[in-house]
């Protein structure tokens, strides 16, 4: 008797599973190099991007946070996209194009940021985010796609998945660390941002082309995209590199900290203006060091003029050199004065000697280093006058704004000596109020010099804090201010107390200066 037909035999065969499109694994050394190199290139971009956008939007906490955030977003998007593509195409055909495209995008970044920066100047959050995105996102995303492509190629044995992924992830992290340290300690100090980025673009292009040649020799692989599109991209990269040489460059020189430029004053042949990150920072008259152009330097000069009898030498300490305007003024008005200048940027010291009439000698000494660290090493009761002029219009070294710093300045200042500190703030004037409260926490007598419009919160301005452990010669200061800047106001006593209100005292533990400076 025959058996009934089987239902199982009648079922259709299951569909065939798709075969992953994956080429042969790369040699371990090549795979490690590609991950190390591409990850390091992302961190070079991130580090240099801060210098690239700084002349247009400043180097504030918000700008730094934007660079880090946009770079991380690009890494996340690139890694995700690279992994998605690796499951749909042979990664061997994508690696070389990713590197070449990253090189092209890096070359194009320079002119794009410099032209866009002229339009997006300022500290608005939208301008910061857009300019940073233009500087970082596309090349960083392309480079971040390299690691998942390499990982997919190397996963030949599922039993070693954890080992392969862990090893390549570690190599990528090591590449980023190496690039960060190399860029921060060596490249930025030695080379202009233009040179660093163009060299990186060239290196990416050459590595991509070399990798493409190697992979096609080992196993013929079709490059993605039509030939015309690839040719157009090559032309775009060359055009980007060429435009970088003619795009508006806000720097004459790039120091380790600043984009610096010196311009001549057309109305005063011996006048020179120092611009740092495209903002006016200092003005000097090469022929007449007693000439003070900016209002706040006139205020400092007025306080210095009455700090001791006319012509008497002083022991002065300057926290920040810039254009060395005030040290030159004191040297001219009080012969024999010992001007000790702490300037963190050695490039500015060299620029001052070359173009701003700075003549180092027994009466003018410049020490390169961080003012906070250097003040800590100064003898107690060693200075008659301390001038704090290290704050910019968008950049404030917060560690110089705290009560601990003010206490160290008070320690260095002789009994009856004077501390003057230049601060720039904008309505609603949260930072200047906090800094006044901070200085007043250490100095028993404090006054404020500022334009009346700024005190009324109608405009941003320089503010000059004057502090001492002895009563200030307020009437003498007022009389001298009336000669050099009749419209300026001098606030002290109850009026100053009302102005400060309940402002916070800044400390090393909590000094949110960037947030206090925000105008929104």
What are these regions (language model features)?
Residues 394-401:
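Glycine/threonine-rich flexible loop motifs
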Residues 216-283, 289-293, 303-306, 450-520:
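Soluble small-group transferase modules, centered on the S-adenosyl donor enzyme superfamily
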Residues 349-380, 385, 394:
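S-adenosyl-L-methionine
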Residues 2-253, 264-268, 278-281, 305, ...:
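Alpha-helical transmembrane segments of multi-pass membrane proteins
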Residues 315, 323-334, 340, 345-348, ...:
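A cross-kingdom signal targeting lumenal/periplasmic-facing segments of multi-pass membrane
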Residues 318, 322, 393:
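Conserved glycine-rich SAM-binding loop
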Residues 402-415:
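A short glycine-rich, Lys/Arg-flanked "PGG" loop and its adjoining helix->strand segment in the class I
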Residues 286-316, 326:
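Extracytosolic and intramembrane catalytic regions of membrane-associated proteins
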């Amino acid at each position: 008797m025959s058996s009934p037909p089987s239902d199982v035999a009648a079922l259709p065969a299951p569909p065939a599973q798709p075969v992953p499109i994956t080429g042969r694994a790369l040699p371990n050394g090549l795979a490690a190099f590609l991950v190390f190199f591409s990850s390091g290139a992302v961190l070079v971009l991130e580090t240099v991007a801060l210098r690239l956008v700084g002349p247009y939007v400043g180097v504030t906490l918000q700008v730094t946070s934007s660079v880090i955030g946009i770079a991380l977003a690009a890494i996340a998007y690139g890694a995700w996209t690279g992994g998605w593509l690796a499951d749909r195409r042979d990664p061997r055909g994508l690696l070389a194009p990713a590197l070449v495209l990253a090189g092209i995008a890096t070359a194009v970044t320079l002119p794009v940021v410099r032209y866009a920066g002229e339009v997006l100047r300022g500290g608005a959050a939208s301008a910061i985010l857009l300019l940073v995105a233009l500087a970082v996102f596309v090349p960083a995303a392309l480079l971040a796609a390299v690691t998942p492509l390499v990982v997919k190629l190397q996963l030949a044995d599922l039993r070693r998945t954890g080992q392969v992924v862990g090893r390549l992830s570690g190599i990528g992290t090591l590449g980023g660390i190496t690039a960060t340290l190399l860029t921060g300690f060596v490249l930025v100090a030695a080379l202009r941002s233009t040179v660093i980025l163009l060299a990186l673009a060239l290196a990416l292009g050459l590595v991509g082309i070399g990798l493409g040649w190697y992979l096609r020799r080992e196993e013929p692989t079709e490059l993605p995209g039509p030939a015309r599109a690839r040719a157009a991209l090559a032309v775009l990269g060359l055009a980007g590199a060429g435009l970088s040489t003619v795009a508006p460059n806000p720097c004459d020189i790039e120091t380790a900290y600043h984009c610096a430029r010196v311009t001549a004053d057309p109305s005063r042949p011996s006048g020179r203006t120092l611009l740092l990150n495209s903002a006016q920072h200092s003005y000097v008259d090469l022929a007449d060091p007693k000439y003070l152009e900016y209002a706040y330097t006139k205020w400092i000069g007025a306080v210095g003029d009455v700090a001791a009898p006319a012509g008497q030498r002083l022991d002065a300490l300057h926290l920040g050199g810039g254009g060395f305007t005030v040290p030159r003024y004191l040297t001219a008005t009080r012969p024999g004065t010992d001007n000790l200048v702490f300037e963190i940027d050695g490039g500015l010291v060299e620029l001052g000697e070359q173009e701003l009439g700075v003549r180092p000698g027994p009466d003018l000494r410049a020490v390169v280093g961080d003012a906070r660290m250097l003040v800590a090493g100064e003898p107690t009761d060693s200075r008659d006058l301390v001038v704090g002029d290290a704050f910019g219009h968008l950049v404030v070294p917060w560690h110089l704004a705290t009560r601990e710093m003010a206490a160290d300045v008070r320690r260095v200042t002789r009994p009856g000596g004077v501390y003057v500190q230049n601060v720039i703030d904008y309505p609603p004037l949260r930072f200047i109020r906090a800094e006044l409260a901070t200085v007043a926490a250490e100095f028993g007598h404090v006054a404020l010099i500022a334009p009346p419009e700024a005190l009324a919160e109608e405009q941003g301005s320089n503010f000059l804090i004057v502090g001492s452990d002895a009563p200030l010669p307020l009437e003498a200061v007022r009389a001298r201010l009336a000669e050099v800047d009749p419209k300026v106001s001098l606030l002290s006593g109850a009026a100053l107390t009302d102005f400060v209100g309940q402002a916070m005292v800044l400390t090393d533990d909590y000094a949110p200066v960037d947030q206090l400076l925000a105008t929104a």
